[in-house]
Amino acid sequence: MLNKNCLFLQVNIHLDEPRPCPLGMGFVEYQPCQPKSMRKLQIEELCRMTVEEFRAAEKLPLTIILDNIRSLHNVGSVFRTADAFRLERVCLCGITACPPSAEMHKTALGAEDSVSWTYYSDALEAVRELQAQDYCVLAVEQVQGSIGLDAFRPESGRKYALVLGNEVKGVQQAVVDACGQSLEIPQYGTKHSLNVSVSAGIVIWEVAKGMRSLRDLQSVALRP
């Protein structure tokens, strides 16, 4: 049973040299069931990068491949998540729409301008190109022999790419075959189905968290 008096706080990912914040925004240590007085932060307190700062900043070596995503809102949401975790690039493949797009902007909120992207006529082309550049490319799909996301541990020094598939058909079988490994989000309900942008948020957070933890341990954390 959920204790309504418990306080849940966002987990902080420390950077070696955080950007200066004039109003001193920061996270506090989590203390179970210790309610505190809290005030919502204003926009100017969030220490957000400018688009130019984002483009110049070091990125997490993680790329997202979108395989025939039909909804512009889903594409925009993935851009926004990629911006949030400072990912390298988004690969837009097949029928996946490219910026600029008013519909995409509704969910991307400008992240389509900050995050680098490349268009490929087929996701298989993107997979093979990234593999040739020594990326470990993983499909996000329900397959035999998939790796549970909760069990996945990124390797130190590796570059990764994640393939997310069409809202109805998922990742193409040929792309799954080319990847050779697949991540699956454990699910416990009746549907065993998540919206692709929701799946993207879950998987990107989990993989990025593991990759950043390794980099922090090596004292080479991302710097703005």
Over which residues does each language-model region extend?
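Post-transcriptional modification and biogenesis factors for structured RNAs
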Residues: 7-10, 20-224
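Hydrophobic alpha-helical membrane-insertion segments
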Residues: 1-2, 13-16
